[in-house]
């Protein structure tokens, strides 16, 4: 007998973190969205070169749901982050100065039976 799944083959039980997504909508216009059902993982890979140790950082963000709340160029902060209201705040809001802040480089929607079930973003 053929068994047909009615649910996505992915368990979203680990999507229990909060992230804040920031986007520059236009000159001087910034949006902030808090997502409470997310999986956010930092990855650090070290490679040894002839001149010393070289490190590379990356991240994976999984957001379940039927919408795509993040796009390339957005900034994502682990936890509930502060408001960013001015150009000066936005310019200072960079990964080198804010621990846990990353910039999205790619967004990949994932589908199950023709419907969006989650997105994976990273950089």
Segments the model singles out, each with a brief description of its role:
Residues 1-62, 98-99, 106-123:
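N-terminal disorder-to-order initiation segments that are Gly/Lys/Arg-biased
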Residues 67-105:
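Short, acidic/charged, Gly/Pro-enriched secondary-structure junctions
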């Amino acid at each position: 007998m053929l068994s047909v799944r009615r649910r996505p083959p992915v368990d979203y039980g680990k999507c229990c973190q909060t992230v804040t997504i920031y986007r520059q909508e236009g000159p001087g216009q910034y949006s902030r969205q808090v997502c409470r059902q997310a999986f956010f993982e930092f990855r650090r890979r070290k490679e040894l070169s002839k001149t010393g140790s070289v490190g590379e950082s990356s991240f994976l963000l999984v957001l379940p749901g039927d919408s795509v709340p993040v796009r390339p160029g957005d900034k994502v902060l682990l936890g509930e982050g502060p408001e960013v209201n001015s150009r000066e705040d936005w310019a200072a809001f960079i990964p080198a100065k804010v621990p846990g802040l990353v910039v999205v480089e790619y967004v990949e929607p994932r589908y199950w039976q023709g419907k969006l079930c989650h997105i994976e973003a990273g950089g």
